[in-house]
């Protein structure tokens, strides 16, 4: 991935929407930053209360439960989110950060001991999986199971098989938590109450399904793309190493430009119009996160990766009520990785790469890497 692309620029600047055929429907993707944020807050017009239809393509064939709380609108969304939000915000606590730092250090030890390392499956996937054990407060050994699922839980030719494996695994986790509750994420849900009643198993699965499927691609993709950029742009790596205080803004810029989720769906309860495109009741639109992040009316030189960019009002973690529950965790992992690279690596050399491209009827978008191999050199004495 040698340069950024923007397949939405022309439509964003002229029409404001891109008509995208998916699964027999033509879904208008909202492209402009201001309009995406406005729609994300307007749940009366653009509703998330649509099980399986918020992701695009939809996931009726991949899971049996509504993902919580993302596939709901306020006030239900608000009340469900309140049950788990404190658990996810632990990612800001020093003890949590220290555990992530130790995982990063161990994986970096292994990377530096090798001549070369493949980043996507050989580094980013293990880091994401082991960091998730910290977030869910389960034994790190569980990560070995998750790593075995591969990079994309719900994608590829075996997506349905993987989805069933995930649901079977989650049911086993809840069975164990109910039999012997602890302080982990699964036990939290078995003990939680929603409006005076215990959660049922479908609700528990809805939370857990999102925790596994929602953030997996995002973190793996962001890690790989950040390392790929530092390998292909040594000046930017030197810029960070010269002053680690720059890492906070650099992390946000990486999240802005390396957005793995192109868009997300909303269902219109009533007839509406989106930049001249009529949408019937029950029809879908999508919020173009990736396009909004490249809107030149908001971001100066949007295709330039500026590690000191500020302000940086990207929408990579969503906007409004549905702001990503895992945002703090993603930021902690990214900052921990960048800090460790700056301290312990002098140079990252690109050895080989194979770009990952999202191909659709309406656009082709480079998403990062299917494979990325680099050589990391420690500082010379």
Task: Name what the model sees in each region.
Residues 1-381:
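Cytochrome P450
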């Amino acid at each position: 991935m040698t340069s950024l692309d923007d397949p939405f620029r022309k439509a964003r600047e002229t029409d404001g929407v891109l008509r995208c055929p998916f699964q027999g429907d033509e879904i208008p993707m909202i492209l402009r930053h201001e309009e995406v944020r406005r729609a994300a807050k307007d749940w009366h017009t653009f509703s998330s209360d649509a099980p399986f239809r918020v992701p695009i393509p939809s996931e009726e064939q991949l899971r049996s439960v509504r993902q919580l709380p993302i596939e709901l609108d306020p006030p239900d969304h608000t009340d469900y989110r309140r049950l788990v939000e404190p658990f996810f915000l632990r990612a800001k606590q020093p003890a949590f950060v220290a555990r992530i730092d130790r995982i990063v250090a161990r994986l970096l030890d292994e990377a530096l001991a090798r001549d070369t390392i493949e980043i996507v499956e050989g580094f980013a996937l293990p880091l994401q999986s082991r960091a998730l054990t910290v977030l869910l407060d389960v034994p790190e050994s569980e990560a070995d199971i998750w790593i075995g699922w591969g990079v994309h839980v719900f994608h590829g030719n075996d997506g349905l098989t993987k989805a069933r494996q995930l649901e079977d695994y989650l049911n086993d986790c809840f069975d164990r938590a109910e039999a012997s509750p602890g302080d982990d994420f699964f036990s939290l849900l078995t003990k939680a109450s929603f409006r005076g009643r215990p959660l049922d198993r479908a609700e528990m699965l809805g939370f857990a399904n999102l925790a596994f499927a929602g953030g997996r691609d995002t973190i793996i993709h962001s890690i790989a793309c950040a390392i790929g950029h530092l390998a292909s742009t040594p000046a930017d790596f030197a810029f960070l190493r010269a002053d680690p205080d720059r890492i906070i803004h650099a992390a946000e810029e990486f999240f802005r430009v390396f957005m793995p989720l192109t868009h997300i769906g909303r269902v219109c309860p009533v007839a509406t119009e989106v930049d001249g495109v009529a949408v019937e009741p029950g029809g879908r639109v999508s919020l173009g996160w990736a396009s909004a992040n490249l809107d030149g009316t908001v971001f100066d030189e949007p295709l330039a990766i500026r590690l000191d960019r500020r302000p940086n009002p990207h929408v990579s973690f969503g906007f409004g009520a549905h702001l990503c529950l895992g945002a703090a965790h993603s930021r902690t992992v990214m900052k921990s990785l960048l800090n460790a690279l700056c301290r312990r690596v002098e140079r990252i050399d690109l050895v080989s790469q194979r770009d990952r491209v999202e191909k659709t009827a309406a656009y082709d978008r480079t998403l990062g890497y299917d494979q990325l191999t680099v050589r990391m050199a420690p500082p010379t004495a």
